[in-house]
Structure formats: C-alpha cells, structure tokens
C-alpha cells in the first residue's frame, strides 16, 4: 500500500492506495505549527479507525504548496513509517512536458492534477481545482502542460467581503433558490454562488477557444460538486483526482 499527501493551504487530504484502488481517504486542517509527532498521532488514530495498519505502507508520496510542512512530513514518514517520502518537485518524473516560462514555479498540485487528468481523460483538457485558490490548468492533446489561470477561491472572496463590509453577516456558501435574493443573506448567497459560477464558466469558455471546442472540462476540490450543479462548462467532477495523480507519479518514479 502507498500513502499520499496532498497538502494545500487550508486542508491536507490523505489517501491510501492498494494497487490502483483508493481504500481510505481523510482530510485534516493545514497547520504549519503542528509537529511531526502531532500529525503522527492523528494518523495512528485514522489508520486504526479505518481498520488499517501503518506497517502496511510501503511508500509515501507528498505534494505540498506549504513549504514549511515539507520537513515536518519528512520527519513524520521517517519516524512513523521508516520511509523517505517522494516529494513532488523538480526532477520528479511526471510524464508531462511542461510548456511554461518557468517550470519550477508551477504548483505541485497543479502538475499532479494534470498527470491524473491526462491519464484518465486524455486531452485537450481543462482541470478546475476549487481550493484556497481556484486554479484552471490547460493540457494539450499531446499531454503538454500549457499553463492556466489562478483566481481567488470562494472562501477567500467571501472572507474578504465579511472583513470589509461591517454590516454583512457571514453566510453559508450554498446554491440559492433564486438569483434574486429577498433578504441580505439570500442576496449574498446569490451573489457569491452565481458570481463564482459565472467566473468559472467564462474562464473555461475562453480556454476552450484556444484549446479547441473538443476540450474536456474536469473539476476537483472541495466545492467542485456544488459549483458543477449550475456550471455550463464542467462536464465531470472527480473528487480524488489529486490523490490519483500522486499514485501515478509514484508508479512512474518507482520504475526508474
């Protein structure tokens, strides 16, 4: 079995694979001040809850956009699994040709998504990942990572609204019954939800003009399912796309 870590700015998503099958997945809050022992204790509890044993893990793969946590997770893996993790970064074999100005600056999570997306759906392809930031990644028919767009995530946008508008309350992000809100909460929910759907669809439509109208559009991330309900461009939601990509990257590097 292999253990994979997808470390984002808000959450750490973990998965355990037996071959190509995802047998367990968990979500923890990202905290760069937690120690390797604190994460280790959490993992012990999660493994036990899922009926798994930590000694079953034969390899670990890490993708992180929070550099301070890299060392913490390396220590975690060495102490609790007696393994050195494969950390996604420069020099790691992905199978993709990275066609951007500076390949070293692209986020590991975006490359991992592109690996899984192209393997599973082919290209041309647009992958929309709803995280702390909303990322749009373009992959060509030949499996080239072409770049993309980065926009503020829905949580960042709503937090900014609450922080700067003293009279506006915090609201839950849901699909409203109508775009015409009849009170402050409903009006905010309509603006947040449909504004975000419109942003996603407009960026995707412009990408498809450049990539070709036969471009597939896949979404992943925490709010993918909610936004896809109303989106005119998202064709499929794959909640575990990043975890699948980490497994694929492990397999491609294990064959070296």
From Swiss-Prot:
What is the E.C. number? 2.7.1.33
Query: Cofactor note from UniProt?
Result: A monovalent cation. Ammonium or potassium.
Protein keywords? ATP-binding, Coenzyme A biosynthesis, Cytoplasm, Kinase, Metal-binding, Nucleotide-binding, Potassium, Transferase
Q: Which residues bind ATP?
A: 6-13, 132
**Where does the protein end up?**
Cytoplasm
Task: Classify the source by domain of life.
Answer: Bacteria
The Swiss-Prot or TrEMBL record lists the needed cofactor(s) as: NH4(+); K(+)
Binding positions for substrate per the UniProt entry: 107-110, 184
For molecular function, the Gene Ontology terms on record are:
ATP binding; metal ion binding; pantothenate kinase activity
Q: Which InterPro entries match?
A: ATPase_NBD (IPR043129), Type_III_PanK (IPR004619)
UniProt-annotated catalytic positions: 109
What reaction does this catalyse? (R)-pantothenate + ATP = (R)-4'-phosphopantothenate + ADP + H(+)
| Primary localization | cytoplasm
GO biological process terms on file: coenzyme A biosynthetic process
- Residues annotated as binding K(+) are 129
Which pathway does it take part in? Cofactor biosynthesis; coenzyme A biosynthesis; CoA from (R)-pantothenate: step 1/5
User: Into which EC class is this enzyme placed?
Assistant: transferase
Q: Give any Gene Ontology cellular component.
A: cytoplasm
Family note = Belongs to the type III pantothenate kinase family.
**NCBIfam families linked:** baf, PRK13318.1-2, PRK13318.1-5, PRK13318.1-6, PRK13321.1
PANTHER family assigned to the protein according to its UniProt record, in alphabetical order: TYPE III PANTOTHENATE KINASE
Q: What is said about its interaction partners and assembly?
A: Homodimer.
The job of this chain, per UniProt, is described as:
Catalyzes the phosphorylation of pantothenate (Pan), the first step in CoA biosynthesis.
Q: What is this protein called?
A: Type III pantothenate kinase
- Organism annotation: Pelotomaculum thermopropionicum (strain DSM 13744 / JCM 10971 / SI)
Q: What is the name of the gene encoding this protein?
A: coaX
